[in-house]
């Protein structure tokens, strides 16, 4: 145990060599002494090392290929979108590392990203996985909850509060984070014609988002909600925050068709109709987003657009089984904790995928379909020691019948509801 020694004479600090009468305090250990000045110096060194470790993720920026390899572990398909994101994110954080004393007059501007694709195509998962890959704070916001300042709804600054909370109120970390704003298409201007009725959840929100997208020092209420005159605010610089905006943009294919029908020489509008949906989305231009209802200034803040494809049965089956955190692996592990094996037949995986397409929910709807088929089993099996294996078949999914249940000898148990 450490103690203060004031009785002994000619004691010196073992680190700096100062006598005890030259310092305020001298702390004794087992044959060694340390003064208050050296303690303060050690404390500063430790704090600097901790700060350096905190920012280590940013000093060891993965290459675009490494980013994409990590995305491939969790996100199936969407190769073009993943490549676009990997390059854009790499350039964004490389730009942050370059900030400081300028060797030339070239200023690298921030490039926010828009993800356009149908519900359940993986927009949110891509953004989440990117943040995890880079070890930066991440927040999700829904554009439909935002309104212009002064109206009922959330101020845009509340988006920043979520990021600050994700960074445990470490502002430096938050200022290098990623914010994903979903359903950005829902704040499109209601029409291209001006109206005497104020569009507080459309163009008004776009105008409010402009500054934080570009980069500004924003005042954020620490408790959320509306700002109050006497409330102390958190100041955060949004210049280096990466914004990823996602939306389905339902009907934008028609906007692209009209443009192609009018501008492609030698092709009639009927021939433009022959473009399939994916081919049309691949040809999206800023003027299409403007015609859809985004204002030009807003489009200018989001120069990178990545298109996500509609997922087919094969892609959905792969999503069910291949990623590190695939749903089949999750539910298999869940029942394994009750000493029960879970198996999905190939036909069952196809049936689950087809039902998700039928419901137009994409990958987002896969979990609910599996949950529906397993809810009774997960309720009953922990109380039934006879069941050692559960097999999900296509009939289980399509006809909502009970899965096949087997005992330890491999005998099929009666398909009626299991009992305790």
Swiss-Prot record:
Binding positions for Zn(2+) per the UniProt entry: 13, 16, 35, 38
Annotated binding of ATP, by residue: 118-125
Database matches in PROSITE patterns: CLPX_ZB
The keyword Iron belongs to this UniProt entry's keyword annotation: no
InterPro entries referenced in this protein's UniProt entry, alphabetically: AAA+_ATPase, ATP-dep_Clp_protease_ClpX, ATPase_AAA_core, Clp_ATPase_C, Clp_protease_ATP-bd_su_ClpX, ClpX_bact, P-loop_NTPase, Znf_CppX_C4
Gene3D superfamilies: 1.10.8.60, ClpX chaperone, C4-type zinc finger domain, P-loop containing nucleotide triphosphate hydrolases
Residue ranges of every copy of the ClpX-type ZB domain listed in the record: 1-54
Single annotated GO MF: protein dimerization activity
Presence of the UniProt keyword ATP-binding in the record: yes
CDD domains: RecA-like_ClpX (cd19497)
SUPFAM superfamilies according to UniProt: Glucocorticoid receptor-like (DNA-binding domain) (SSF57716), P-loop containing nucleoside triphosphate hydrolases (SSF52540)
Top-level taxon of the source organism: Bacteria
GO cellular component: HslUV protease complex
GO biological process terms on file: cell division; proteolysis involved in protein catabolic process
Keyword field: ATP-binding, Chaperone, Metal-binding, Nucleotide-binding, Zinc
Pfam families named in the record: AAA_2, ClpB_D2-small, zf-C4_ClpX
Subunit composition and interactions: Component of the ClpX-ClpP complex. Forms a hexameric ring that, in the presence of ATP, binds to fourteen ClpP subunits assembled into a disk-like structure with a central cavity, resembling the structure of eukaryotic proteasomes.
UniProt cross-references to HAMAP family, sorted A to Z: ClpX
Functional description taken from the UniProt entry: ATP-dependent specificity component of the Clp protease. It directs the protease to specific substrates. Can perform chaperone functions in the absence of ClpP.
Family affiliation: Belongs to the ClpX chaperone family.
Protein name: ATP-dependent Clp protease ATP-binding subunit ClpX
